[in-house]
Structures are given as C-alpha cells and as structure tokens.
C-alpha cells in the first residue's frame, strides 16, 4: 500500500476535494480526498484560520507543523481543536485515550539549535492532556540558510543534529518519537 500526504495549502483546491463518506464505524463523515493525510504548515496554522478549521472538520488524519515560536499552551489548544475528546461509547473511540489515536501528528520544525530547549515543554504539556498524538520531526525547514550564491540550502550536520535532538527529547521525557517528516521529490531541487 502507498499512502500520501501533502500540505493543505491551496484553499480552492482543498474545498473542491471535500466529499462525504462513511468512516470505519459506518457513520457519515467529511473527507478531504486530496491525500490520505493533510498537514498544515507553520505559516498557515492560525488557530481560527481556514486551514486549521478545515482540518478540524475533516475525518482524515491531520498533521500540524510547530516551530520555535509555538508555546506549550498553543500546542495544547491545537490538540484540543484538532483531536477533540470523544465519548467513551463513540464509534472509533479507544478506551484510555482522549480523542482518536492516530488522528493528529505534531511535526516539530525547531532547528538544530532550539530543538532541545523548545520542544520539551511542548511535549510535556501535550502529553499531560491525555491525548496520544504522533510526534514527528521535520529537520529540513528549521535549518535553512541562504548560501553565498543566493540559493536556499541546509547543512547536513545540522539536519542530523536536529533529528538526534528530537529523539533525545522524547527519550528523556518518556514519550514516543513517531518518526521524521521529509518532503521529497524525484527531481533536482534548487530553491
């Protein structure tokens, strides 16, 4: 099986891809057919803006990028909006969990120099809510710089250091690191 994910960025495109269907419990649910999972980028994640409201409405799994400006309180507010509590007898509910396991992925993009200080209080605050989000690390976007020739690039050692820091944070807290988030293409990329 192949599963795809993409940033739910273009409003008109995402609206055109909305369809009603049945969820695994047979209930009518709204889905975004543009991908199996859609995610919201760091710059479009206003909690009351279109992108977050769309993600709250659909039944797809959703991801949310969080950066170094994200506070623990903001992270908790996103979790409560995007993975709200459900009744114990609700279809798809798993006893002992708030929300729906697998519904929400928080993708940290902190940068190698901030991951070890900014991420721990966010993870601790979210874990304290009882929600079981998937934690991922995007080590590319927080480590971008412009080279002397004007191209955006990344230093591989910094990318690896951010990934290592991500796993160190989760090991120290006792939370589960769900993996890394890498955008890719089969083409050469110059930004």
What are the functions of these language-model segments?
Residues 105-106, 110-137, 141-189:
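Non-transmembrane, aqueous-exposed alpha-helical and coiled segments at domain scale
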Residues 1-111, 151-154, 162-163, 176-183, ...:
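Active-site-facing alpha/beta catalytic cores
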